[in-house]
Amino acid sequence: MKRFLKAWRKTSLIKKITIGVVIGLFLGILVPKASAIGLLGQLFVGGLKAIAPLLVFTLVISALSQHREGGKTNMSTIIGLYITATFAAALIAVVVNYIFPLTLILKTPAKTDLLPPKGISEVFQSLLLKIVDNPIHAITEANYMSILFWAVIFGLAMRSSNQRTKDLMQTFADATSQVVKWIINLAPIGIMGLVFTSISENGIAILGDYGLLILVLVGTMLFVALVVNPIIAFVMMRKNPYPLVLRCLKDSGITAFFTRSSAANIPVNMRLCEDLGLDKDTYSVSIPLGAAINMAGAAITINILTLAAVNTLGITVDFPTAFLLSVVAAVSACGASGVTGGSLLLIPVACSLFGISNDVAMQVVGVGFIVGVIQDSCETALNSSTDVLFTAVAEKSVFGKK
């Protein structure tokens, strides 16, 4: 037993997670009714979601209160990269539709009581109202736009505080970070539970009914992750981007895939940024901001499902209209965190461009919920891993350096 524990401690976290995935897969097939195993996954995700808002709040306040005048944070570059990548992903999804046009069987209404927004203006109105939420309520409800807003305000206000007060805030941030590390070390057990739940509840039958749709969605996201994002990174860094890209996918994308929550993956991304030696003043803000607005995966989902509906109804779409759809999808995706139901509930906004009725659009949303187990996992993995990628790329960029 001692030898086993010693070997386990020396094993890297990714290898431990891989072992957890394999065990969860077999347990889901062999003992699908052992629901207690799934509880481990719920506890893990719950722990990450519980600590993440406090982590963001304390880190941002601490970083801003001790920020040096004239210090460079690269935030404008990072936001530019977030927007560029989201639009590029939306455009790639349009191109994929021309190569692999999909059609859907629209006969089952969406199994959801959620109502889609009436337009982009409603999406951003909701987002703006969430920003000025009560800070205590924002932390308890994991409203990251509001958490960031108030953390920035408090951080700037604390710049004039004495050093002892700033050190106390830093100690609180360090203690929160330590709790996060303890929770992340439980990832192999938690992910084992998540894999078990996914396999025992959904099985693999979903692949047969919606295999082509899943293949196109996942394939497009992989293309963006392994081709488009590396091209953007190369343009910025002027060196081989793949070691960084693959590191982000391995250390951030894998956990995001199983937690299916950008918010829950914030602590994982913070730790990865620390391991990469990035500037804490920058990543303490860019990572939670990315979790809210960096939505390349959402843009892909919106465009592919919307254009599949267009193809199903026999509507002809010229490229200028498809380009406009890319703009709408990119803008809508950036506001996905302000909509209950995320990217799927923004599909009716995009469908409205083509005069598709809300009834039909909600049937498309229903198809999205059916493939959501795989779609949402891949979407979150792409979104969350690129938060770290573009934070690192901005810091390593050749532009602006003498």
From Swiss-Prot:
It is a multi-pass membrane protein. One of its GO terms (cellular component) is plasma membrane. InterPro entries: Na-dicarboxylate_symporter (IPR001991), Na:dicarbo_symporter_sf (IPR036458), Ser_Thr_transp_SstT (IPR023025). It comes from the Bacteria. It is found in: Cell membrane. The chain crosses the membrane at residues 19-39, 43-63, 86-106, 138-158, 179-199, 212-232, 287-307, 327-347, 354-374. Belongs to the dicarboxylate/amino acid:cation symporter (DAACS) (TC 2.A.23) family. Involved in the import of serine and threonine into the cell, with the concomitant import of sodium (symport system). This is Serine/threonine transporter SstT. It comes from Streptococcus agalactiae serotype III (strain NEM316). The lineage of its organism: Bacteria, Bacillati, Bacillota, Bacilli, Lactobacillales.
